[in-house]
Amino acid sequence: MRESSQIRETTETKIKLSLQLDEGKNVSVQTGVGFFDHMLTLFARHGRFGLQVEAEGDVFVDAHHTVEDVGIVLGNCLKEALQNKEGINRYGSAYVPMDESLGFVAIDISGRSYIVFQGELTNPKLGDFDTELTEEFFRAVAHAANITLHARILYGSNTHHKIEALFKAFGRALREAVERNAHITGVNSTKGML
């Protein structure tokens, strides 16, 4: 089974995270940031991943360190769980509508970290979650996992719906990218490595 568990402790946060790429039944998320918990749960459910997150952070300051560090640990776990990346599709993409909003995510498990994030989040805060942290989370995941990630909000008016569409699209795109493919021998690259 492709899985990874890691702990990251700093003076700002303590993150314990486990990710199972091939088993999506066990999802439990507690970060102390309610909206972020909701988004991570949606990501796991729509990607059919197992995900357990326990996070403690300096949320009395704001949620920035917690959200970013969870992204770092998730990216690290993804990188470790994929091992040598043999036999996977490598690429994945998904459009996801959420009522009036439409989100799109494309992923390349390339071994090169890069992110493009496009979208207007008009409401600056949802509960304890600063909406600008959406981009910070995706950036942290992409850099830690060494993947290329494009996330785009095509349109919408409700900020909650826009972010929800992105997290669901992220789960679905990542599921496609990590899926094993019987037609792929070795790694899906002419270089012979990713």
Curated annotation (Swiss-Prot):
Location(s) in or outside the cell: Cytoplasm
Keyword DNA-binding: no
GO biological process: L-histidine biosynthetic process
PROSITE patterns xref list: IGP_DEHYDRATASE_1 (PS00954), IGP_DEHYDRATASE_2 (PS00955)
One of the record's GO molecular function terms: imidazoleglycerol-phosphate dehydratase activity
Catalytically driven reaction(s): D-erythro-1-(imidazol-4-yl)glycerol 3-phosphate = 3-(imidazol-4-yl)-2-oxopropyl phosphate + H2O
Entry's family note: Belongs to the imidazoleglycerol-phosphate dehydratase family.
HAMAP family with a match to the protein in the record: HisB (MF_00076)
This protein's name: Imidazoleglycerol-phosphate dehydratase
